[in-house]
Each structure stands twice: as C-alpha cells, then as structure tokens.
Amino acid sequence: MVKEKRRLNHRGTQGLTIVGECLRSRLLHNSSSYRFNVINSLLERKIEKRPDKVRLQGRILFLTEDPELIKRQLAGEDLPWDTKNPANNPKLRDDISTDEITPAHYCFYFDETLGEIPYLGLKCGSVTPIGRGEVKRGGFVCAVSGKRRGKGSSREQSPYAEMCAGIQVVIAENIERIYKQNCQNLGVLTSTDFSLIDRIRGGEEIPLSEFTAGEDEITRQVIEYGGLFPFNVARMQKKVTLPPIENIAKLEMAGNVRRYAAPPMTLAEKIFARHMLNENGEVGVAAVKPGDTGFAQADLRFSHEYVTPMAAIFFERYVGKDAKVNDASSIIFFRDHLTFLDEVISEEKKKLGLLDLATQLKFKQQDFAAKQGIKLHGELKDRKGSEGICHSIVLESYALPGQLNIGSDSHTPHVGAIGCVAFGIGTTDVFNSWITKDVRVKVPESVRILIRGKKRENVTAKDFILKILSLDYVRSGKALAKVMEYAGEAIEELSVDERSTMTNMAAEIGGFTGIVAPDKKAVDFLVERRGMDRNKAQSMIAGLYSDADAQYAHVIELNAAEITPMVATPGDPGNGKYVRELNTPVPVEIAYGGTCTAGKNEDMDMYAAVLADALKRGKRVADSVKFYIQFGSQETRDYCLRKGYLDVFQKAGAHVIEPSCGACINAGPGVSTRPDQVVISAQNRNFPGRSGPGQMYLASPFTVAASAVAGYIVEYEPNEKKELVEA
C-alpha cells in the first residue's frame, strides 16, 4: 500500500481574489432576474468597514442574581466591579434565555419598538426587576452576565432589542451559538473577556481586534463590516477573502488501482463536505474538518410567522422592495406559532395592541409569500388550527437523508432523525440566504452520545434527552455549538419519531445540531410515510455513517437500563431528576402533550396507551387536572383518527387541539395563568415565562399522561404494578 498526501481545492492567492466573482456567477446562473433586479444594485452599493477602534460612551448593566442590585443600576447607580478579584463581585445570572430577553408576546414587534423590551422577562429569584424602557433610559452600552447567555429560541428579536436599547457590547462567560451569531450579524459586539469592563468604563479606545480575537476569518470580517449583510455585499464586490478549505487526501494503491481517499469523517462532516462551496463556486469539497469555515449551500430554507415578517422587512429595506428571492422553490413558510393566540392572550396585552400586531405578522408573511411565489403552509380552511408545525411537516414531507437544511427556529435539528444536517438560524441569516442560497458555516466538532443496552418499557427518548441535559458536561456549556451524534443499541431501537425527540432537543443542549445515522428504520420511514420507492430510499442513505476512525470532541456513554422516567424541574430543561427522586407528591393542574417534540404519531401512541389503560380500570383524567393533547400536524391528526385515538382521548377527559406550537410559545391552550400553578408538559423547554407564569415540569408523553390521570407527577407503569391514586 502506497500512501501520499495531496491537497485538494487549494485556492492560493488567485483563489482568494475570485471568490466574489464565483458568487456572482452562481447567483446569475441560478436566476436570470438576479442580473437586473438584485445583483447589479448590490454591486453598486457603497460598503465600508467599521472603524478599527471602538470607544463606548455609556454605562454597563450587570445582570445579577440579586434583583435589588439591578434595580439600583436602573435608578442610576453604577455597580462597582472588581475585575482582579472576581470573588468579590455579586453573582451574575447564568442561563439567561432569549425568552427572558424578549418574552414571546413582545416579539410581535419587528421594528425599533423592540428597544423598549430587553430583559422584561428576566427573573431573579421570583422577581422580574426590569420594566419597559428602563434599559434604554438608563444609557447602558454594555450588558454583562454569566454562563450560557442567550440559550433557547433563535429569535433575533433579542439582540435586536438590545441593540435598539443602546447595547453595543455583550459580555458573558460563554455565549450560545445562535444568539452569538445573531449579535454578530446585526453588528452587536460579543466577548468573554471580563477585563474589557474596566476599559469600557475608562472610555478607552479598544481595538476592534479585541472582539475578533479567536474568531474564524469569515466571522472576523463579518464583525469588521458591521454585520452579515454588508459583509455579503462586500463578498459580491470582491472586497473580502474566504479562507481555503485545505482537504488532505491520501493516495492509496489497491493492486493497480490508484485512488484518493478522504480522511475519516463523522456523519455530519461528510454532509458538510457535500455542501460547502469550493473556490469555483461549485457545491462540494473532498473533505472538511472541525474549524473549517466557508459557505454551505442549503437544500431547504424555511421560516415561520415569528421571523418571516422581520426578514421580509430587512430584505425589502436592504435589497429592494421589488427584488426577488433566489430560488423560491426551495423556500417554505409556515403559519404555526400563533394560530391560537387569541384564546390565551390577556386583556392587558390586547389593550397594548399585541394581538393586532400578531395578526399583522400573519398578513405580512402571506403577502410576501404571494409576491415571491413561496409555498406557505398556513391555517386550515374549515376549522381553527394550522396545517402543522414547521418541524413536523419538514420531517413528514421535505427533509431527506444527507441534506443540509436551515430554518428560523432553534429546533430545526428535529429532522436530523433521518440523517440530515439541519440547524437554526436568525433573521439576518434567513434574509441573506434568500439572496445567496447559502449560509456561513464553521464546521463544528462532534460529540458522540452512545446509549447502550435496552431501555425500560416506560422509558422514552424524552427521558434519555433529559438525562443527557442533566450531565455536568452539558450544564457547564462544554457541548455548546457542537454536533450531537446519537448512537448505540438503545438509539437503534428507537423509531424515527422518537429519534427526532432527541435531535430536536439538541437545541436545549446548546448544540449546533443533532443527528442519527440513517438505517433501515429511516428507510422504512421514507417508504411508509412518504411513499418513496424502497430502492431509492436505500440508495439515499449509502455512505451516511461516521467512519470508524472519525474524531470526536467528547464521548458520552449511558446505560439505557439504568435510566428511569425523568422530569426537568421548573426553570430549565437541565434540571433533570428521576421521578422517583421527587421527595413529596407534586400535584398538577395542567398537563400538556404536544408541540414539535411531542406531537408526533408515536407520542400519540403513548398518550393513548396510558389513557386506554386508565379507562380499563375505570379511571379518567383527574378532576383537578386539565389535560391538553395537541397534534403536531394534520398527518398526525389523521393517524389518530384511523387508530381510534380521538375517541379514547374524549372518553378519558382530554381536550384535543388542532396543530400549532401553542402553549410551548405561550400562545395557546395549556399555558399557566398563575405563578403557583403547576404544569407537567411534554414540550422541550421550561424557561421562566416560556409558557406562562407557572411552575413547569418537563416529562415524557408517558409521564405526562399518567400524571394527568393521577393528579400528581408519577411514572407510568404499563403492567399496572403501581396503582395510580387520584389526588
């Protein structure tokens, strides 16, 4: 065997200078209308870099655990901060979610009004210390917090609200990927360097390089140009350089046959390699490795009514009111988040005009879709509800193994269950992808999560992911921006529906995406649920696996047999605890089964199994509990109709709801209305204020349904080893 190394796709200096020409050629080839309507106008646009030094004039807001310290800052006091002796400083809030930065109802704004909103949902203990407009009036230019800032939703309204309130710099111990990228795309600076605090307060001119240190070459230039859109215009004008992807291939001799073999790669790396653009603007390179940066062409781009209107406004403002998107056939819009908002929004919020604003989101998306010729999965014609949640429909009808998909939602990794790389992006990434059909990517490291052995009968994928979320490796932020690759015998036994629960909740881990290597179960899914020819489906998954010598940043191993039903206690999905570890019975008032995570066919099997068991024993949903079951899509509703589940749900006392994100986004039946109200939900996150003011526990469909019958949180015992006693 003879081996030598050869560099493929090496650009060199000439390659660096032709990147803009390649992008222009590719766009012009994709759509002739771009020649006149978009590209020429952008090529004439004047684009300049921001100054190479930054001087901030204003105050610093420390987001502390102590609400009184925050109130004192809002009243005008500048909090002392000892950068040399951090132990002397008050504790900063960790795990600040985008739900806290911009609570869902205020995301109905998509203009500078958001500057009145930042941190309205921030909870310090039981107190929300920041009122509307107080950050903006306080003259703050920098906000400081602890670990995992910006976790949760991909909503770009959060950094946009901060920016409109005057915040120019965000400092935290570590920062979630999507939130950080949204900040960079908008021009908000981010850092994990706490020594900047004294320098900002001292009015020092800080080199911009302090904020680009450690970033890849593309991100550095995005920051230097003040955001993604000006960077992309500069990219078309040949003013920027893209780093070469230097793929090393080995020449192997097998008899008389010479071939170049790519180095070992993970499944995700293989898919990235298929989609990265080379120096000629062509799609695909021989291999990639973690840290490689560039642009990847997306097979599918989608967004929903929370994001599409803001992206459309940006597109019309910066590109042109009459400009057309690039390849409308690969873009999909969804009306899924706010379908039932009118049933739960408070009178106070109605008086603020928020319901009217939410309706405008719907109309703006409809109008933009019609104008651009983009497919919109909207509301039902004959009854209230949506066609389905975006993630549910994308898995049921669109995503394919080996694809690279991007969506305006943090739970876009849902479809990784059939072996595609799918990840969430923010508004600016969305509208830029409408121009370029690609997305900037830094190839992430992968974490291999092996779940060995055989699971218990009452344990589900949701219990697995809640266990993973409770691990120190995840809670400390070490998994941030990495691919979660799930494998092992217990994963292989899971259906595609169950696997999607785990890939979906890679978002709660803070991962880049989640993925499972496609196998016979993925093929069966494509054949049985999509009607695809089996040979075609089988050929589609060829080569989609991680190589034996692929490199991982970390490996997590769990024994499925040791995992029992779990809950995440209120406040964070990482607060995992076994149900049997709850010290006292926890009565519940609301049980909720639904959302993209738990509104699938197999989730309905679980709700129906528990309720059918209860009916056999003469029991129903406890009188003290309201149990809501919401379908993820019309396909799942039809499945329940065929299986006879609707009758079971009705007889057992559950309330059935047509598809929508609903309670998970504080916009439908199942939300809490009082701080002391206890909810058990099969949704994916329970950040403060996410689904109302109450105390939310996360659990599996089995546990949610069993608790609805019992009246308090219990494990489901399929063999009736334990009698459910109504509270």
Please provide the spans of the model-predicted regions.
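Fe-S-dependent hydro-lyases/dehydratases of central metabolism
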Residues: M1-R7, G12-A727
